[in-house]
């Protein structure tokens, strides 16, 4: 998976507010499966700790279903997803070279 959305760029940042986790194990029906291209909220161990960070599934991740709030699906750009997934990373899986999302379209 590819994770982003940290305003501090450290991997630990977020906003001042958290979002209630909208997934099955937290009492909210969410039938969107974590398949390749699905976008979901990142969080800590606390199910209601989602903030600004999100991740995009590079491969199918069915083990996340029911425990993470999937909320969107990519419709194109899978070649870019593959390119980002192939970028060299450090031992903490952070890319050596910063990656940025330049445009997003929500439909």
Enumerate the predicted regions with their spans:
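Cyclophilin-like peptidyl-prolyl cis-trans isomerases
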Residues: 1-107
């Amino acid at each position: 998976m590819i994770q982003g959305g940290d305003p501090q760029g450290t991997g630990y940042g977020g906003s001042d507010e958290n979002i209630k986790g909208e997934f099955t194990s937290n009492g909210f029906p969410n039938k969107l499966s974590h398949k390749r291209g699905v976008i979901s909220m990142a969080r800590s161990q606390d199910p209601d700790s989602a903030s600004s960070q999100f991740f995009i599934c590079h491969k199918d991740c069915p083990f996340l279903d029911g425990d993470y709030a999937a909320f969107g699906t990519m419709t194109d750009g899978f070649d870019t997803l593959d390119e980002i997934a192939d970028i060299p990373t450090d031992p903490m899986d952070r890319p050596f070279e910063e990656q940025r999302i330049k445009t997003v379209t929500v439909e």
